[in-house]
Swiss-Prot record:
This is Transcobalamin-2. Primary vitamin B12-binding and transport protein. Delivers cobalamin to cells. It comes from Bos taurus (Bovine). GO terms for molecular function: cobalamin binding; metal ion binding. It holds the Pfam family Cobalamin_bind.
Length: 432
């Protein structure tokens, strides 16, 4: 019996495998170490670095950060209300860029609900109206004939519906209908790990709508869409046990754990995913705060859908900062990484020498400092992402894809990925 088979046997016990999705009895030490990685991020309180997902993840986990949690929520409220509710200024051309995205607003609403707050009052109503307007604008971009696309993504569209749903705020049937149609008729929604994230978020939005019955006329379509979403995510499971890849697995499990459609296939798939996640925790795979915040609820058998009725009195273990071991002085080792740019003319190819352990972002900065390479990034909750390379800005429905040879898209962001010696990194402008 292989290692994975043996672990599945231990996890499943001597009886038959369950037909529901449960992620229980995960090593508490591994979970604590995961939570400890979020603590330094809770000291970063600038508008650019505040991340509502961190607060949501902790509140739905078995861990707590004590007084730091309350201070973090207070900082979120100040930042989001001031930036989103202030009047638009003609004097500041970057005013719109400084405001949180609608996806971030949706996460902020989830954070409020994670503290057992219902959004309300004049300020709260204005935020709800902003999110509803965003959904209406996206609905118009998709079009009456469904031939268009959201200006942002179906992920943010789904997240917006979910955030309003947990606050018992109804959106129009036509808004829900656009997401239903996408799941029913757009197979490209599930082609890679990003699409697993999108499908899982859409499924959680549908789950909330099903449980809350906010759109009763759409109930039958919602039920069928949830069945379709579950089937597609289960089919996306890799031989290693991940849904899409390791980083898309937490959101997929959040959806599957709340499934009202039990089956042996579901139970087996979740046991396999749990075994894979256990291995990833032991290898310290999760370092990005957004990914950690999506995983922590899973390890406590919770999901964003539980924010319909959160349990704010549940006991949670207090996190203590990890003890840091002073780094030993070492002679730095250098590695060589080949950097290529394709999809534009002229192309670019250059070898960069950097200290071992450098992030891809560090490598790009080094190439910029010592040659003609130029790049720009934009901050996001998952870290910086490329917006411009060699002066070429990604246009509408374009993005700069990052790959490593042989033609493998990176699963991590440029701030998290650390290339190895001799590796080739390609930046490719692609459409979507």
């Amino acid at each position: 019996m292989g290692h994975l088979g043996a672990l599945l046997f231990l996890l499943g016990g001597l009886g038959a495998l369950a037909n529901i999705c449960e992620i229980t009895e995960v090593d508490s030490t591994l979970v604590e170490r995961l939570g400890q990685r979020l603590l330094p991020w809770m000291d970063r309180l600038s508008q650019e670095q505040l991340n509502p997902s961190i607060y949501v993840g902790l509140r739905l986990s078995s861990l707590q950060a004590g007084a730091k949690e309350a201070h973090y929520l207070h900082s979120l409220k100040l930042s989001y209300q001031q930036s989103l509710l202030r009047p638009a200024s003609n004097k500041d051309d970057n005013d719109s860029e400084a405001k949180p995205s609608m996806g971030q607003l949706a996460l902020y609403l989830l954070a409020l609900r994670a503290n057992c707050e219902f959004i309300g009052g004049r300020k709260g109503d204005r935020l709800v109206s902003q999110l509803k307007r965003f959904l209406e604008d996206e609905k118009r971009a998709i079009g009456h004939n469904h031939q268009g696309h959201p200006r942002t993504s179906y992920y943010q569209y789904s997240l917006g519906i979910l955030a309003l749903c947990v606050h018992q705020k109804r959106v129009h049937d036509s808004v829900v209908g656009k997401l239903l149609y996408a799941v029913e008729h757009k197979p490209h929604l599930l082609q890679d790990h990003v699409s697993v994230d999108t499908m899982a978020m859409a499924g959680m939005a549908f789950s909330c709508l099903e449980l809350s019955n906010l759109n009763p006329k759409q109930r039958n379509r919602i039920n069928l869409a949830l069945k379709r979403v579950q089937e597609k995510i289960l089919k996306a499971q890799t031989p290693e046990g991940y849904f899409g890849n390791v980083y898309s697995t937490p959101l997929a499990l959040q959806l599957l754990m709340g499934s009202l459609r039990p089956s042996v296939e579901l139970g087996t798939a979740c046991l396999k995913a749990k075994a894979a996640l256990q291995a990833s925790l032991q290898h310290k795979t999760f370092q990005n705060p957004l990914m950690i915040s999506q995983l922590l609820p899973v390890l406590n058998q919770k999901s964003y859908v539980d924010l319909i009725s959160p349990d704010c009195q549940a006991p949670r273990a207090l996190l203590e900062p990890a003890l840091e071991t002073p780094p030993q002085a070492k002679v730095p080792k250098f590695i060589d990484v080949l950097l290529k740019v394709s999809g534009i003319s002229p192309s670019y190819r250059h070898s960069v020498s950097v200290p071992a352990g450098s992030s891809l972002e560090d490598i790009l900065k080094n190439a910029q400092e010592h040659g003609r390479f130029r790049f720009r990034t934009q901050a996001s909750l998952s870290g910086p992402f490329l917006t411009s390379v060699l002066g070429r800005k990604a246009g509408e429905r374009e993005f700069w894809q990052v790959l490593r040879d042989p033609d493998t898209p990176l699963q991590q962001g440029i701030a998290d990925y650390r290339p190895k010696d001799g590796e080739t990194i390609e930046l490719r402008l692609v459409g979507w």
